[in-house]
Amino acid sequence: FGTMADMDELIAESKKRGIGILIDLTLNHCSDQHRWFRAAKSSRDNPYHDYFLWRDGTPDCPPSGMRSVFGGSAWTYVPEIGQWYFHQFAPEQPDMNWENPKLRQELYDVMKFWVKKGVAGFRLDVIDQIAKEPDKDITINGPRLHEYLRGISENVLTDEGLVTVGRSWLLKNRLFQPQPWRP
């Protein structure tokens, strides 16, 4: 909590003491209260609609049987537009569609904002889940993951002094187990 002025002061005072501030970012999903998602669910024609993962369907039949990490379906129906959106976590945390280059650019811009403010880097939560393919039941370490990470590196992490930490809390349970989508 606090203001942007408070954050500016925290960054400046921390630097004076040789301490770097890392911003904790979740680039996989956002809040269902975020302006992008509110706009996205207002109309299939809204420019933000493709910032999220949507599938057609009827109210009583989700697009697949995928389960949320927290239990229940990984799909939530929006009757106003007759579509389901995908969420690996809570329904209040819709997953973003990293296949959309406009979304990626907006997320790069968010990160650049913080770099310009003077942060030392980022902790990227569940970063291994941005390249999902829900139609193939792939929600972690998807085929485009390295491409997306390279995009972050090339567009944002160009300052050699920046620190990045990626968190993968599902990987620890699957590291030495065969993946269902791999032979």
Give the positions of each predicted feature.
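Acidic/aromatic-lined carbohydrate-recognition and catalytic surfaces
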Residues: 1-108, 112, 116, 127-182
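Hydrophobic residues within beta-strands of alpha/beta enzymes
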Residues: 122-124
